[in-house]
């Protein structure tokens, strides 16, 4: 093999796995990270090992094999054994557009997003698993709430000048809201949820018993009416509900009113609260009771008409059953499934509508065959006197109910009926599996989210003081040549300050080889001590400053890898301090 071919070869070490290809292969996708490796000055901008003559990237080696194959074949496939977010992150790192994924793998690639959207749709904490709060001290005592409160104190975000939480409202509003809205937030929230569930069941039971004749005795009533010449006594009989059922319903309404008012007052977003359908149901179910109580003492005709109307609309109380969705995951899953399967339901309705129209018309004309000459409407030997009546028969037949109130009586009508039944079975069976799959997906995701182990409280470190060497940077106290480091986000203003100081000291502005705002590059001249090779381990040397900070962590030489001059100019680093690894994200 000629020397030119050898110079065209390039070795890329990704996560310990060495990959070999040609520079011309990497140039097939200009503007990507691998295409920049083919540039002549790539050695100074990337993690290059001159001894092994290879570039090193601390990324996923399995995904990189598919990405490199994309440069070779021009087709990007998605591995089935890699989680979607990981593959998406790798594509973003290597600078490849996700729309380049082949159609055969697009659904596999999209699965993680569908799962994330499904998990986000559950959103609230009722599906968040949390351990039994046996040691909970009060409502809303959750780990996340304490972490947020601690973070507020640490970051001095409190309204009070002395660092205390900003008043009663700020302290108790989220706790009381979680107490009535999130049954899984604390032990006391569970008690409130059990009480609400009890009153819901009692209210629905009372509503059903009020319609039973045992609890609606017939009573004789007398009414005096004014007539022209005097008064007239009218006697009539009326069914009257037992008083104890009304009292029970009143107690339930008092609880629902208290619960509704507490949720309204302590709701963090009043507009979203009003738009919530469950909250509208709560209000509509409560209002008729108070109107009925307020108008019961009036004897005017208008008041009686309103009372009669309110007694009719008592059925809205049954809508309280939907409040159970706050307490049962399965009901919430069903609701999400119905919303996610809207297109399938519309498709099912369209199929049924077409079938109903076709078979209702066919059965009408099929039953008219053989009609007697003296019976032009064929009403004597068939039930299908017109096409609209056939709509009912077609719906009942296609859904395989078959009430038997209408049926064909001629051989041609029986043939149409058989075809209608078969078409109904096939039509309904097509969209149903999609709906069932949606339910299974939502239910499995809900169960997985509910069974997630409770996250431990995060350690919130004390913020370093101004002037401290650790101010807005991370110094890893690990042994020399360690490859592990913690990260600390660096403010953009501080990066600009470093660039300005570097420009003043070296007489030129630091240039970035990659236009990547998420990975800032500081290209600066180094002192002789700082010019020592960066090392990852005892056997690997790296020359040049850290450029791709996300490809790995770097260990600086014992002489110090951080400019002392910058410490004087920038508030980020107040004094010179030997560091083993500094990582900027």
From Swiss-Prot:
<feature type="glycosylation site" description="N-linked (GlcNAc...) asparagine">
    <location>
        <position position="220"/>
    </location>
</feature>
<feature type="topological domain" description="Cytoplasmic">
    <location>
        <begin position="1"/>
        <end position="190"/>
    </location>
</feature>
<keyword id="KW-0966">Cell projection</keyword>
<dbReference type="GO" id="GO:0042734">
    <property type="term" value="C:presynaptic membrane"/>
</dbReference>
<dbReference type="GO" id="GO:1990089">
    <property type="term" value="P:response to nerve growth factor"/>
</dbReference>
<dbReference type="GO" id="GO:0034767">
    <property type="term" value="P:positive regulation of monoatomic ion transmembrane transport"/>
</dbReference>
<dbReference type="GO" id="GO:0032809">
    <property type="term" value="C:neuronal cell body membrane"/>
</dbReference>
<dbReference type="GO" id="GO:0034765">
    <property type="term" value="P:regulation of monoatomic ion transmembrane transport"/>
</dbReference>
<feature type="transmembrane region" description="Helical; Name=Segment S1">
    <location>
        <begin position="191"/>
        <end position="209"/>
    </location>
</feature>
<comment type="function">
    <text>Voltage-gated potassium channel that opens in response to the voltage difference across the membrane and through which potassium ions pass in accordance with their electrochemical gradient. The mechanism is time-dependent and inactivation is slow. Plays an important role in the rapid repolarization of fast-firing brain neurons. Can form functional homotetrameric channels and heterotetrameric channels that contain variable proportions of KCNC2, and possibly other family members as well. Contributes to fire sustained trains of very brief action potentials at high frequency in pallidal neurons.</text>
</comment>
<feature type="transmembrane region" description="Helical; Voltage-sensor; Name=Segment S4">
    <location>
        <begin position="309"/>
        <end position="331"/>
    </location>
</feature>
<feature type="transmembrane region" description="Helical; Name=Segment S3">
    <location>
        <begin position="277"/>
        <end position="295"/>
    </location>
</feature>
<feature type="binding site">
    <location>
        <position position="83"/>
    </location>
    <ligand>
        <name>Zn(2+)</name>
    </ligand>
</feature>
<dbReference type="GO" id="GO:0099508">
    <property type="term" value="F:voltage-gated monoatomic ion channel activity involved in regulation of presynaptic membrane potential"/>
</dbReference>
<dbReference type="GO" id="GO:0005249">
    <property type="term" value="F:voltage-gated potassium channel activity"/>
</dbReference>
<feature type="topological domain" description="Cytoplasmic">
    <location>
        <begin position="268"/>
        <end position="276"/>
    </location>
</feature>
<feature type="topological domain" description="Cytoplasmic">
    <location>
        <begin position="437"/>
        <end position="585"/>
    </location>
</feature>
<dbReference type="GO" id="GO:0043679">
    <property type="term" value="C:axon terminus"/>
</dbReference>
<comment type="subunit">
    <text>Homotetramer. Homomultimer. Heteromultimer with KCNG3, KCNG4 and KCNV2. Heteromultimer with KCNC2. Heterotetramer with KCNC3. Interacts with the ancillary subunits KCNE1 and KCNE2; the interaction modulates channel activity.</text>
</comment>
<dbReference type="GO" id="GO:0032590">
    <property type="term" value="C:dendrite membrane"/>
</dbReference>
<keyword id="KW-0851">Voltage-gated channel</keyword>
<dbReference type="GO" id="GO:0021759">
    <property type="term" value="P:globus pallidus development"/>
</dbReference>
<dbReference type="GO" id="GO:0045211">
    <property type="term" value="C:postsynaptic membrane"/>
</dbReference>
<keyword id="KW-1003">Cell membrane</keyword>
<dbReference type="GO" id="GO:0008076">
    <property type="term" value="C:voltage-gated potassium channel complex"/>
</dbReference>
<feature type="binding site">
    <location>
        <position position="400"/>
    </location>
    <ligand>
        <name>K(+)</name>
    </ligand>
</feature>
<feature type="modified residue" description="Phosphothreonine">
    <location>
        <position position="483"/>
    </location>
</feature>
<dbReference type="GO" id="GO:1901381">
    <property type="term" value="P:positive regulation of potassium ion transmembrane transport"/>
</dbReference>
<keyword id="KW-0813">Transport</keyword>
<feature type="transmembrane region" description="Helical; Name=Segment S5">
    <location>
        <begin position="345"/>
        <end position="366"/>
    </location>
</feature>
<dbReference type="GO" id="GO:0046872">
    <property type="term" value="F:metal ion binding"/>
</dbReference>
<feature type="short sequence motif" description="Selectivity filter">
    <location>
        <begin position="400"/>
        <end position="405"/>
    </location>
</feature>
<dbReference type="GO" id="GO:0035864">
    <property type="term" value="P:response to potassium ion"/>
</dbReference>
<keyword id="KW-0770">Synapse</keyword>
<dbReference type="GO" id="GO:0014075">
    <property type="term" value="P:response to amine"/>
</dbReference>
<dbReference type="InterPro" id="IPR005821">
    <property type="entry name" value="Ion_trans_dom"/>
</dbReference>
<dbReference type="GO" id="GO:0009636">
    <property type="term" value="P:response to toxic substance"/>
</dbReference>
<dbReference type="GO" id="GO:0010996">
    <property type="term" value="P:response to auditory stimulus"/>
</dbReference>
<dbReference type="GO" id="GO:0043025">
    <property type="term" value="C:neuronal cell body"/>
</dbReference>
<feature type="modified residue" description="Phosphoserine">
    <location>
        <position position="474"/>
    </location>
</feature>
<dbReference type="InterPro" id="IPR000210">
    <property type="entry name" value="BTB/POZ_dom"/>
</dbReference>
<dbReference type="InterPro" id="IPR028325">
    <property type="entry name" value="VG_K_chnl"/>
</dbReference>
């Amino acid at each position: 093999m000629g020397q030119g071919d050898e110079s065209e070869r390039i070795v890329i070490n990704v996560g310990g796995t060495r990959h070999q290809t040609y520079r011309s292969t990497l140039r097939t996708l200009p503007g990507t990270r691998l295409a920049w490796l083919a540039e002549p000055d790539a050695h100074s901008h990337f993690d290059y090992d001159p001894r092994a003559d290879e570039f090193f990237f601390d990324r996923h080696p399995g995904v990189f094999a598919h990405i490199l194959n994309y440069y070779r074949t021009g087709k990007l496939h998605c591995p089935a054994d890699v989680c979607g977010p990981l593959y998406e992150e790798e594509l973003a790192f290597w600078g490849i557009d996700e729309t380049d994924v082949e159609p055969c793998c697009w659904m596999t690639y999209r699965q993680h997003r569908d799962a994330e959207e499904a998990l986000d749709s559950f959103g609230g904490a009722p599906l968040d698993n949390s351990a039994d709060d046996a040691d909970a001290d009060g409502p809303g005592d959750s780990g996340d709430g304490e972490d947020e409160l601690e973070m507020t104190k640490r970051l001095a975000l409190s309204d009070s000048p002395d660092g205390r939480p900003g008043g009663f409202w700020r302290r108790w509003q989220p706790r009381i809201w979680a107490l009535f809205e999130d049954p899984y937030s604390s032990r006391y929230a569970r008690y409130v949820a059990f009480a609400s569930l009890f009153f819901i069941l009692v209210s629905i039971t009372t509503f059903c018993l009020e319609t039973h004749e045992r609890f609606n005795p017939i009573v004789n009533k007398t009414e005096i009416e004014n007539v022209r010449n005097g008064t007239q006594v009218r006697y009539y009989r009326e069914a009257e509900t037992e008083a104890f059922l009304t009292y029970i319903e009143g107690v339930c309404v008092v609880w629902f009113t208290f619960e509704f008012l507490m949720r309204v007052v302590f709701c963090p977003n009043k507009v979203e609260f009003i738009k919530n359908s469950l909250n509208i149901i709560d209000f509509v179910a409560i209002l008729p009771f108070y109107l009925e109580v307020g108008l019961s003492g009036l004897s005017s005709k208008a008041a009686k008409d309103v009372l009669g109307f309110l007694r009719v609309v008592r059925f809205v109380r049954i809508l309280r059953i939907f409040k159970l969705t706050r307490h049962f995951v399965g009901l919430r899953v069903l609701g999400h499934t119905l919303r996610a399967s809207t297109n399938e339901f519309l498709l099912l309705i369209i199929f049924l509508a077409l079938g109903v129209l076709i078979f209702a018309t066919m059965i009408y004309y099929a039953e008219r065959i053989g009609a007697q000459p003296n019976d032009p409407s064929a009403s004597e030997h068939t039930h299908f006197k017109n096409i609209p009546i056939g709509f009912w028969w077609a719906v009942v037949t296609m859904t395989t109910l078959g009430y038997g109130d209408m049926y064909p009586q001629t051989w041609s009508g029986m043939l149409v009926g058989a075809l209608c039944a078969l078409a109904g079975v096939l039509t309904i069976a097509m969209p149903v599996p999609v709906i069932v799959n949606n339910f299974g997906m939502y239910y499995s995701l809900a169960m997985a989210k509910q069974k997630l182990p409770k996250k431990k409280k995060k350690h919130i470190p004390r913020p370093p003081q101004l002037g401290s060497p650790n101010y807005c940077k991370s110094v890893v106290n690990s042994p020399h040549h360690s490859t592990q480091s913690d990260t600390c986000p660096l403010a953009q203003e501080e990066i600009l300050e470093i660039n300005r100081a570097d420009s003043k000291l070296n007489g030129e502005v630091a240039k970035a080889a990659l236009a990547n705002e998420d990975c800032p590059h500081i290209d600066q001249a180094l002192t002789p001590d700082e010019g020592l090779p960066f090392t990852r381990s005892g056997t690997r040397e790296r020359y040049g400053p850290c450029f791709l900070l996300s490809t790995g962590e770097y260990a600086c030489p014992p002489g110090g890898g951080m400019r002392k001059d910058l410490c004087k100019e920038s508030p980020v680093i107040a004094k010179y301090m030997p560091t083993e690894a500094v990582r900027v994200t």
